[in-house]
């Protein structure tokens, strides 16, 4: 065997070794990418589950608060609810600590369009002489008016808002009214934000 043939054989072995190395490296990288993708997917699913559980716990916390308000209102009787009683009830709660993220709690009065003038007289006689109904979009149907809201200092702009004047609020309010269950609205912009 001459030197020329020996060099040729060596270069073939070197080429084959290089090709095999590249193939094995490629397969290893592909396998590692699959493992990494699977681990990333599993980590994302775990995080999504944890986030969903946290959101569920937060919503349940708000439900407890709303049920507490409902219990107080049912105990007092809807006809006896006034601004001072609602304010005193709200003082028994530490809204920021008990319901983190909530801006406050309110009482929404269902008012037939034909009864609007009488409702306004009653609301103004209840220590709110400037009370007026605010509509985001004019409509002829019944009103769902935020009559009381606490704390007023950071929610005053919502006082008098007819939530039936905006579709997302109206749909959530009707569903809550019909089912007796808490409902979330679709995306909205708070008037007091």
Language-model features: locations:
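A general, composition-driven signal for non-globular sequence regions
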Residues: 1-6, 56-57, 126-128, 168
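Extreme N-terminal signal-anchor transmembrane helix of membrane signaling/transducer proteins, especially
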Residues: 2-35
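Aromatic-enriched hydrophobic runs in primary sequence
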Residues: 14-20, 31, 50-53, 89, ...
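Juxtamembrane membrane-water interface segments immediately C-terminal to a transmembrane helix
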Residues: 31-64, 70-77
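Intrinsically disordered, low-complexity polar/acidic regions
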Residues: 41, 45-49, 74-193
